Amino acid sequence: MQRVSGGYYDGRRFRRGTVGWEDGVIVETTSGLAREPLAKGLIIPPLWNAHTHLGDAVVTRELSGSIEELVAPPRGLKHRVLARARDQDVIRAMRRALVTALNAGTGGVIDFREGGIKGLKLVYRALLGLPTRAAVLGRPSGLTFNRREVSALLRACDGIGVSSYIDWPAGELRKLAAHAAQAGKSFATHCSERVREDIDAVLELKPTFLVHMIHATDSDLERCAEARVPVVICPRSNAFFGMTPDVPRLLRAGIEVWLGTDNAMISTPSLLREMEFAYRIARLRGGVPAMEILEMALRGRRFVDPKATTGIRVGNPADLVVFALPDGEHGFASLLRAVEADIALVVSGGIARRPPLPSEEPTGTKRLRPRRAQRTSR
């Protein structure tokens, strides 16, 4: 059996003790400290990045312009760059972004993948050999519903993730969402990022989650809470465009909030940076506890397993991150100031490694398969 010691997060607080695992499963959590643990410090499950656009990591220029000019389909900058970029350049850029996420303690991502079937192939090549889970939400190559194309997409990914309700002809989007539901796959969309959108029309699509909700009213948020639809916030991306999510208001409405990093061309996919920034911008509107920010960064796992806990428990997969930080009563605050260099050990499927992970593609990756998350039904 292998063990780590310090303060482990049980879903409510940090308990001083030891976590032990074997055969890829956590088999003990004890109050005593191991004599020779693999690492000591603050112990948490891996972070889950609930919203990324990894493909636009290929865009490296300094950016200026509005949301529409940079990211809106079909003529936003990222779409123009992706359309003419070499496949290998896109793959390398996505792989660098994934390694950045891994080295910041992330164990899984939910990626919105542009480019139809070809886009899916590229992200799966980028994932080859990396010790991460990825839930990939594809989208059609255009803003129209083509049953054959969508059926092929849904056979190859975990669902559909689109840019916005207002970007699509309403009838086409309803067909797209219905087809995903019929296939037993997820449907998700950005909502009220640029302007307020019709929340009733959006919720009629039965989304698994929504992203942003910057311009949502209190009534809109109440409707989301009633429908039990989580909202992913991406504060650094929003701030780039001169906006910030009202985190306390989202929580007061009773919404389950997840944390993501959004476009890789705007923000590095580091949830450590996102957590710190989310905590700071929440203070502008009254603040939220540091523990709540950590919870947001862990809840994205519920996309693939709705019953997943955010704490470390016996019987859970042996997926852990150990930070070389003091494990006392201020553990939550310490995590919100943590940087990549503070990570002492990462455990994935019971296999422990010391960071950082190199970004170079390993030899023989053509024979490897990406570790794609398999979502259970809600």
Regions found by a protein language model. Give the residues of each.
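N-terminal metal-binding scaffold of metallo-dependent hydrolase/deaminase domains
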Residues: 1-33, 375
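Divalent metal-coordination and catalytic microenvironments
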Residues: 6, 24, 40, 51, ...
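Active-site gating loops and adjacent loop-to-helix segments of metal-dependent hydrolytic enzymes
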Residues: 57-92, 131, 154, 195, ...
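Active-site loop-helix segments enriched in His/Asp/Glu that coordinate
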Residues: 82-157, 163-171
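Active-site core of metal-dependent hydrolases
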Residues: 143-146, 154-265
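His/Asp/Glu-enriched, well-ordered alpha-helical/loop segment
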Residues: 204-205, 247-326, 338, 344
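C-terminal cap of metal-dependent C-N hydrolases
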Residues: 314-378
